[in-house]
Design a protein with these regions (language model features):
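C-terminal motif of bacterial Sec signal peptides marking the signal peptidase cleavage site
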Residues: 14-17
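Positively charged n-region of N-terminal signal peptides that target proteins for export
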Residues: 1-4
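Low-complexity, acidic Ser/Thr/Pro/Gly-rich terminal tails and inter-domain linkers that flank the onset
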Residues: 25-54
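Extended, well-structured beta-strand/loop surface patches
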Residues: 80-182
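Asparagine-centered strand-capping/turn motif at beta-strand->loop junctions
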Residues: 66-70
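Bacterial signal peptide processing site
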Residues: 19-21
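Structural beta-strand segments of beta-rich domains
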Residues: 58-62
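Short, hydrophobic/aromatic beta-strand segments
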Residues: 72-80
């Protein structure tokens, strides 16, 4: 009986010790990264936001840049309506704001070390089967108004190049940033 009692006390101390460590974890940082960069071969992709926290109703500027850093003076890339995709997730409500892309093939020449830049334009999608909260949320984001919440921006590029033998090389560098709307 005494062994069982000691075992029970030991288990309680172990559980209490684990809970104590859990309580000491710092809260998640509210200083979100304003810039993220990734490189795939001769291409740098930068995703940035003007500041980490915004007031509801104020404009939010999210920028993507693609820079060719190779040896040639320039390179031709091929992509859809834009080489950039901006997929957003609002984590408070768990809503996704997907990137929608036109599908024409566009040819663009990038000069070495000169960034090509685009700014995120508001988006959102819903249909007649979407829940009313999602519809209202998307209507606001489509007008460029982000409701209060925490947002994760998963930015990426999607393009390819061709060599003189018409061999395609695909590129899809990506980066992630976050921001809050209060």
């Amino acid at each position: 009986m005494q062994k069982k009692f000691l075992l029970l006390i030991s288990m309680l101390l172990l559980v209490a010790a684990c809970q104590e460590k859990e309580a000491l974890k710092p809260p998640p940082s509210k200083n979100y990264s304003q810039t993220a960069t990734s490189q795939q071969e001769d291409f740098l992709y930068d995703l940035s936001i003007s500041k980490p926290t915004f007031t509801e109703g104020k404009s939010i500027k999210i920028t993507a840049k693609l820079t060719y850093v190779g040896q040639a003076q320039n390179v031709t890339i091929y992509h859809g309506g834009s080489p950039f995709l901006f997929n957003l997730q609002e984590t408070t409500r768990n809503f996704e704001i997907p990137s929608v892309m036109d599908t024409p093939l566009i040819t663009r020449i990038l000069e070495r070390n000169v960034p090509y830049e685009e700014v995120y334009t508001s988006g959102g999608v819903y249909d007649e089967f979407s829940e009313p909260k999602l519809v209202e949320f998307m209507k606001q984001t489509m007008k460029g108004h982000f409701p209060k919440g925490h947002y994760i921006v998963k930015g990426s590029t999607d393009f390819y190049t061709e060599d003189p033998n018409e061999q395609k090389t695909e590129y899809k560098p990506s980066a992630t940033i976050e921001f809050n709307v209060q």
